[in-house]
Amino acid sequence: MSFSALVPFLSIVVPMREGVPAQWLEALRRVQGDVEFILVYPPSAQLEKIADERLLQLVSPFRGEIAQRLTGLLNASGRYVLTFNCDELIHPEVPELARRYFEQFPDSWVMRLSKEEFPYGNTAALNAPWEALPENLAALPICRQADGNLALYESGHMLEIPIAPMHNRFDWKCWWRGRRDHQGPHAENFDKKVWVNEKVQATLQEILPGLGLVGPVKYLPFWCLDRLLGLALQAKFYDAARPKQVIGHKLPRPALLRVEDNPPEFRRRARFYLFAEIILLRRFPQYGYIWNLIVHQIREFPVRAMSAVKRRLVAG
């Protein structure tokens, strides 16, 4: 995909659900800068009547956070793209901050948002005034991978994000102790980060054919696109000559995203990603890092399955 001067700087994609409070939509529309909002609703949902030329409302052919997110991403026209959820609040100045970041770090692929998490129902903290953001990001101290001290991030350093170590060899020990090469400052997930959209669109075209199983039968990763897309992008653009390439930074506080915990009746559960990551393996079988991930998921399958059965028995 090529971009002209007429396209928005940032596309913000949000999968929607029924009953999103009007206050959330009002907060979203307070976001400043050259931005397009792509709100993607489940089938048969009623669209909001909002007069805002920055707003594009779509209806996904399938219900589900990830199916809706995928629909939005395929329609994103901005130079950069960001996804988050419809129960999360974003700092109004994020688009302009992202502009400054990519001007000052033009080789970066990704800017990871700092976030603050709150217990369910803490509306006072969620709606508190936002803090001022730095003008010159290049003047911030940087926590580099070579420093070997990730704690520097907590003291106000920007954290370097190296590319995922795709070159790692397959580790047979994953079968009995699980994988360990996921630990470190690199990122696996796609969500809550500002990405170069040209790379995102190229990666989507890379993985979409992998959704085909047998003939017309398709597999749609209803809850697994996050890590699938994040790692597929890094695998597609991985340069073996630069195994420690820095592809972006995680910004320090103040928080750019506020995340409210789920209500007690909808507590977060561990999700099983294997089927989505088989798509990743089919496309990039040459990387040991992905094999380690797959083996770890296979190893976890009995535990996750037993936990799911136990929850159903308790609920029933």
Model features per residue range: what roles?
Residues V13-G33:
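Short, well-formed alpha-helical segments that are part of the catalytic scaffolds
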Residues S60-A76:
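Glycine-rich, basic loop-to-helix element that forms the pyrophosphate-binding segment
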Residues V81:
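Short aromatic/hydrophobic "clamp" motif used to bind/position activated sugar donors
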Residues E88-Y101:
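Acidic donor-binding/catalytic loop of UDP-sugar-dependent glycosyltransferases
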Residues M111-L140:
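Short beta-strand-to-loop element that shapes/binds the nucleotide-sugar donor at the catalytic cleft/hinge
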Residues F118, E188-V194, E198-W223, Q234-F266:
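Active-site donor/metal-binding and catalytic loop motifs
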Residues C143-K199:
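A recurrent flexible, glycine/aromatic-enriched loop bordering the glycosyltransferase active site
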Residues P221-W223, R227-Y238, R258-L293:
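Catalytic core of nucleotide-sugar-dependent glycosyltransferases
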